[in-house]
Amino acid sequence: DFVITGCGTGQGALMALNTFPGVTCGYCIEPTDAYLFAQVNNGNALSLPFAKGFGWGAELNMRYIFEKAFDGEKGLGYPAERRESQNANAIILSNMKEAVSKPLMDALQAIDPELLKQALGGEKFQKCFFNNSKDKELVNYVKNLLDR
């Protein structure tokens, strides 16, 4: 899975996503950021600024960001001769994050349920989540939370 998120500056969404286990979110304000993140960090989420700098030509910038984020194989390194060290560093970062993170269900159960209900209450999110989630435990947790 790959998540595209954002907020006014993109910084808040970046910080929020990076608190979750298994998520490596990068900050992307231009296509080069998307390309380098895909090649060097090989993460699974991007945070975009939806207000800051979103003027003329923003739709073109957004299109080019998506092209660079999803075009071709990820994790090839940039420049290519740095691939091995960059991949090794990405694994080290992932292992460090895993060592200090709670499992997702433990994390969700530690968060204020009203905050979660607000965050998960959107109709479009729910449609996407319930139609695509493969984690039965997570689906049941979210259903029960929203039914409270």
Where are these regions (language model features)?
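Short hydrophobic alpha-helical runs that function as membrane-insertion/retention elements
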Residues: 5, 24-28, 45-47
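Residues at structural and domain junctions
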Residues: 2-3, 23, 52
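Short, structured active-site "lid" loops
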Residues: 1-5, 9
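Short Gly/Pro-enriched loop/turn and capping motifs at secondary-structure junctions
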Residues: 10-12, 53-54
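C-terminal binding/interaction regions
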Residues: 35-148
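Short Gly/Thr/Asp-enriched flexible loops that form oxyanion-binding sites at enzyme active sites
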Residues: 12-25, 29-33
